[in-house]
């Protein structure tokens, strides 16, 4: 209404002589008061024919705000990744094999630039904070519900017993919860899901189907049980041949992914002797099956602890691979091992020999014996030598529990 009154008034004023010669001062005051509300209206300009009589201050400057831009960009990328996963699932239902779509170098570099080591150390310290007694049940119950943890298998089922998250993650199981299979040569060292298994060919190991990593990059230069390095491998095949110590044997591998809800300890998969430990400081990227399918040589990028030695058929190794929030890898008999430490730089490795003048063999391990633990879910990689008639009794993607058979002769 105020706008229409203003236009009428302006129309009357158009082409009229100056106000002081035709209007009484009282009329001027009344007209001014009637136009006063127009100053508060959200319009940019009023025009009388071609003349502009009022212009509001323009506020069109665009302010760049990093956080909204990052949220929009990250959300769009996450949405795209979810669409790709949905598309892959639909194609798998149709029985179509989908070639893996690998991350580019810039994507891997961008991911590695995230301070996952620092974040994992912070997470580790947070896990050590003692929870109030009244808060333990709701916090642990939420975790149990989210990741499907079976507390009936725990040695201590009372949630109030666990003072902090770290103790809860590393909970022990009842002895009868995981019977160890005595009929097979190699058992699963942990709970988890089988990502891949089979024979090592051309010095390339499959982390998932169609995505490989270099055997030499993963294990590092060969070290023998006497802690003396072999000469550098002249070719990929010669490095593989260094690991195979007996004629007629082949090299095999098995990759087991531990989800956050799985039992976090790992055990000896067979009777063997550990003679050497190699620690690779590295990134702590996620190792879930989706990432393993997306990033080539993921396990070579991440921090890991390689235990090597011998079993009755020759070379045997177990590697614990770290992941996001899983910088802490503990080996029970190795007190000198400290993972995800700021003093360790990426791109190097640290060796330690368990063979000494007083112990010429190393550390003997029995099948099923406690070997180590993660602070959260991660990955175990077995690489070992065995006769050609060794058979895995597995399916890719199957769930497996510690103590169940992996394979036998």
From Swiss-Prot:
<keyword id="KW-0670">Pyruvate</keyword>
<keyword id="KW-0809">Transit peptide</keyword>
<feature type="active site" description="Charge relay system; for autoendoproteolytic cleavage activity">
    <location>
        <position position="378"/>
    </location>
</feature>
<keyword id="KW-0898">Cataract</keyword>
<dbReference type="InterPro" id="IPR033661">
    <property type="entry name" value="PSD_type1_euk"/>
</dbReference>
<dbReference type="GO" id="GO:0010821">
    <property type="term" value="P:regulation of mitochondrion organization"/>
</dbReference>
<feature type="topological domain" description="Mitochondrial matrix">
    <location>
        <begin position="53"/>
        <end position="63"/>
    </location>
</feature>
<keyword id="KW-0991">Intellectual disability</keyword>
<feature type="modified residue" description="Pyruvic acid (Ser); by autocatalysis">
    <location>
        <position position="378"/>
    </location>
</feature>
<dbReference type="GO" id="GO:0005829">
    <property type="term" value="C:cytosol"/>
</dbReference>
<dbReference type="GO" id="GO:0005811">
    <property type="term" value="C:lipid droplet"/>
</dbReference>
<dbReference type="GO" id="GO:0004609">
    <property type="term" value="F:phosphatidylserine decarboxylase activity"/>
</dbReference>
<keyword id="KW-0594">Phospholipid biosynthesis</keyword>
<dbReference type="GO" id="GO:0005739">
    <property type="term" value="C:mitochondrion"/>
</dbReference>
<dbReference type="GO" id="GO:0140042">
    <property type="term" value="P:lipid droplet formation"/>
</dbReference>
<feature type="transmembrane region" description="Helical">
    <location>
        <begin position="64"/>
        <end position="82"/>
    </location>
</feature>
<protein>
    <recommendedName>
        <fullName>Phosphatidylserine decarboxylase proenzyme, mitochondrial</fullName>
        <ecNumber>4.1.1.65</ecNumber>
    </recommendedName>
</protein>
<comment type="subunit">
    <text>Heterodimer of a large membrane-associated beta subunit and a small pyruvoyl-containing alpha subunit.</text>
</comment>
<feature type="topological domain" description="Mitochondrial intermembrane">
    <location>
        <begin position="83"/>
        <end position="409"/>
    </location>
</feature>
<keyword id="KW-1208">Phospholipid metabolism</keyword>
<feature type="site" description="Cleavage (non-hydrolytic); by autocatalysis">
    <location>
        <begin position="377"/>
        <end position="378"/>
    </location>
</feature>
<feature type="active site" description="Charge relay system; for autoendoproteolytic cleavage activity">
    <location>
        <position position="191"/>
    </location>
</feature>
<dbReference type="GO" id="GO:0005794">
    <property type="term" value="C:Golgi apparatus"/>
</dbReference>
<keyword id="KW-0444">Lipid biosynthesis</keyword>
<keyword id="KW-0456">Lyase</keyword>
<keyword id="KW-0963">Cytoplasm</keyword>
<keyword id="KW-0225">Disease variant</keyword>
<comment type="function">
    <text>Catalyzes the formation of phosphatidylethanolamine (PtdEtn) from phosphatidylserine (PtdSer). Plays a central role in phospholipid metabolism and in the interorganelle trafficking of phosphatidylserine. May be involved in lipid droplet biogenesis at the endoplasmic reticulum membrane.</text>
</comment>
<feature type="active site" description="Schiff-base intermediate with substrate; via pyruvic acid; for decarboxylase activity">
    <location>
        <position position="378"/>
    </location>
</feature>
<dbReference type="GO" id="GO:0005743">
    <property type="term" value="C:mitochondrial inner membrane"/>
</dbReference>
<dbReference type="GO" id="GO:0005634">
    <property type="term" value="C:nucleus"/>
</dbReference>
<keyword id="KW-0242">Dwarfism</keyword>
<comment type="similarity">
    <text>Belongs to the phosphatidylserine decarboxylase family. PSD-B subfamily. Eukaryotic type I sub-subfamily.</text>
</comment>
<comment type="pathway">
    <text>Phospholipid metabolism; phosphatidylethanolamine biosynthesis.</text>
</comment>
<keyword id="KW-0812">Transmembrane</keyword>
<feature type="transit peptide" description="Mitochondrion">
    <location>
        <begin position="1"/>
        <end position="52"/>
    </location>
</feature>
<keyword id="KW-0472">Membrane</keyword>
<feature type="active site" description="Charge relay system; for autoendoproteolytic cleavage activity">
    <location>
        <position position="267"/>
    </location>
</feature>
<dbReference type="InterPro" id="IPR003817">
    <property type="entry name" value="PS_Dcarbxylase"/>
</dbReference>
<keyword id="KW-1133">Transmembrane helix</keyword>
<keyword id="KW-0210">Decarboxylase</keyword>
<dbReference type="Pfam" id="PF02666">
    <property type="entry name" value="PS_Dcarbxylase"/>
</dbReference>
């Amino acid at each position: 209404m105020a706008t229409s009154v203003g236009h009428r008034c302006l129309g009357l004023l158009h082409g009229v002589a100056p106000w002081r010669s035709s209007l009484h001062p009282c009329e001027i005051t009344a007209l001014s008061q009637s136009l006063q509300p127009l100053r508060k209206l959200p319009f940019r300009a009023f025009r009388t024919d071609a003349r502009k009589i009022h212009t509001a201050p323009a506020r069109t400057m665009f302010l760049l705000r990093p956080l909204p831009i990052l949220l929009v960009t990250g959300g769009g990328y996450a949405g795209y990744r979810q669409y790709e996963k949905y598309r892959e699932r639909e194609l798998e239902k149709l029985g179509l094999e989908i070639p893996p779509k690998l991350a580019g170098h810039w994507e891997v570099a961008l991911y590695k630039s995230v301070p996952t080591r620092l974040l994992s150390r912070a997470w580790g310290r947070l896990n050590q904070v003692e929870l109030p007694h009244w808060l333990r049940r709701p916090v642990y119950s939420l975790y149990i519900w989210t990741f499907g943890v079976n507390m009936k298998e725990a040695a201590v089922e009372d949630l109030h017993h666990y003072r902090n998250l770290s103790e809860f993650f590393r909970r022990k199981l009842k002895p009868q919860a995981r019977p160890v299979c005595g009929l097979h040569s190699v058992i699963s060292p942990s709970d988890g899901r089988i990502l891949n298994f089979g024979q090592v060919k051309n010095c390339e190991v499959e982390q998932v189907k169609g995505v490989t990593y270099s055997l030499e990059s993963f294990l590092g230069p060969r070290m023998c049980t006497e802690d003396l390095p072999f000469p550098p491998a002249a070719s990929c095949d010669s490095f593989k041949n260094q690991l195979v110590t007996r004629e007629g044997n082949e090299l095999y591998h098995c990759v087991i992914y531990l989800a956050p809800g799985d039992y976090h300890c790992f055990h000896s998969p067979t009777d063997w002797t550990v003679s050497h430990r190699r620690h690779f400081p590295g990134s702590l990227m996620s190792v879930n099956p989706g990432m393993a399918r997306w990033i080539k040589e993921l396990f070579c990028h991440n921090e890991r602890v390689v235990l090597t030695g011998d079993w009755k058929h020759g070379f045997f190794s177990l590697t614990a691979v770290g992941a996001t929030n899983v910088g802490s890898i503990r080996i029970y008999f190795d007190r000198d091992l400290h993972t995800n430490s700021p003093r360790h730089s990426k791109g190097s490795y640290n060796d330690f020999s368990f063979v000494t003048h007083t112990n010429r063999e190393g550390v003997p391990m029995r099948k099923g014996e406690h070997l180590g633990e993660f602070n959260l879910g991660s990955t175990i990689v077995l690489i070992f030598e065995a006769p050609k008639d060794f058979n895995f009794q597995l399916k890719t993607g199957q769930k497996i529990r510690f103590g169940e058979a992996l394979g036998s002769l």
